[in-house]
Amino acid sequence: MKFIVKLFPEIMMKSKPVRMRFTKMLETNIRNVLKKVDETAKVKREWDKIMVLVPDDRQDLVEAFAERLACIPGIAHVLQVSESTFESVDDIYQQTLAVYKDELAGKTFCVRVKRVGNHDFRSIEVERYVGGGLNQFTEAAGVRLKNPDMTINLEIDKESLYLVSKRIEGLGGYPMATQEDVLSLISGGFDSGVSSYQFIKRGSRTHYCFFNLGGDQHEIGVKQVAYHLWQKYGESHKVKFISIPFDPVVTEILEKIDNGQMGVILKRMMMRAAAKVARKMGIQALVTGEAMGQVSSQTLTNLSIIDRCTDQLILRPLIAMDKQDIINLSRKIGTEDLSKSIPEYCGVISQRPTVKAVLSKIEAEELKFSEDLIDRVIEAAEVIDIREIATSMDTKITSTETVGDINSGEVIIDVRAPEEEEQSPLEVEGVEVKAIPFFRLATKFADLDKSKTYLLYCDRGVMSKLQALYLQEQGYDNVKVYRP
């Protein structure tokens, strides 16, 4: 069994050297991701596609490979195929009949053929021959070229025949690291998660800069969002997570700044700090989740004034998107439930925000700040490899017990994503196991029996630890981490 990975159309339009570079990078990215599933994963690059081979004795890898290929930037779609050779058009028909005869019963169908190489027949001739044979010698309801119940896809590549059993839509976009790095200002809300995803999809290694205004509980929630985005869509490359303690800045704003100017000035201070961090990391652009008119600081006048605080390029991929469209996309990429549980801190500091700030007034207010304020908070920033999030939390989860044995009455909560849980469900004899995905646990945990102790489980022990800390900060002491 094989997967045929089809390149995103914009890659196909590039010049030969650029297309080759992008395809090589995509091959490397696929290999990096799949080798985390199975070390023996075989990936082969061709001019117009990439082949992923699944050994006949490892069919257990099919679903895992398919799931990960669907989330790698640069892929238009993936075809799950079985490969064989053929001698004639009739041989192609006979092989197709053997595979699809039973499945066609009572259904309308059409046959679609794509062909590469020199043959003594055309693609349409194969479609007619195979379609006519299937219509005559199966119990199909007939041929229907538009909107059939079933489409039989065949790919012919020189002497090879590929019978397509499944088509999996890809993420699109460009392969990771074919574009320059960006630093995304992430708050954990709907907007910043979606804007980060947009640049991952577009091929940029997306690092995360978080301004902590709400303590450890806020930080752990944001780390969950960032880790989820990286693990699902950008796992092929290392990125950094930077946490900047911004409460000293907020304190000075509340004590010294005119109330109406607070929102714009807070954003300008964030941009200044992020720009300094980006320059240290050799990153040219910042990414934010701002959308025009969504809040008072996001009018065109205010955005223009915010931009003037730095010469760093500031990118806003959501600038013209409606809020509901942003929420819908966050649901699609798996961050909606995580973002729902994270409060928005920026909006609470100004009661009468200006929607049309004046630059001279803003600059006059900013003279009230301590001169070294930004440098001090950057100096106190925590910079970690996003893969080390679990390790970094070990020092904070001092009261969370990690257990390998289960006591009577304890309940296991499997916090893995639904597709992972379905692929390899956790079963422990004599123990109740509840499947609650990590992104729903924050809202579902309050409904559980408070008299019981819950053991959180995931494959790597990362999300279970993050969720344990999060729940403990909310006041729950009946939670542990389960590592069998």
From Swiss-Prot:
PROSITE patterns assigned to the protein according to its UniProt record, in alphabetical order: RHODANESE_3 (PS50206), THUMP (PS51165)
Domain Rhodanese, first and last residues per copy: 406-484
UniProt catalytic activity: [ThiI sulfur-carrier protein]-S-sulfanyl-L-cysteine + a uridine in tRNA + 2 reduced [2Fe-2S]-[ferredoxin] + ATP + H(+) = [ThiI sulfur-carrier protein]-L-cysteine + a 4-thiouridine in tRNA + 2 oxidized [2Fe-2S]-[ferredoxin] + AMP + diphosphate; [ThiS sulfur-carrier protein]-C-terminal Gly-Gly-AMP + S-sulfanyl-L-cysteinyl-[cysteine desulfurase] + AH2 = [ThiS sulfur-carrier protein]-C-terminal-Gly-aminoethanethioate + L-cysteinyl-[cysteine desulfurase] + A + AMP + 2 H(+)
This protein's name: tRNA sulfurtransferase
Primary location recorded for the protein, binned into one broad class: cytoplasm
Species whose genome carries this gene: Shewanella woodyi (strain ATCC 51908 / MS32)
Keyword ATP-binding recorded: yes
One MF annotation (Gene Ontology) recorded for this entry: tRNA-uracil-4 sulfurtransferase activity
Gene3D superfamilies: 3.30.2130.30, HUPs, Rhodanese-like domain
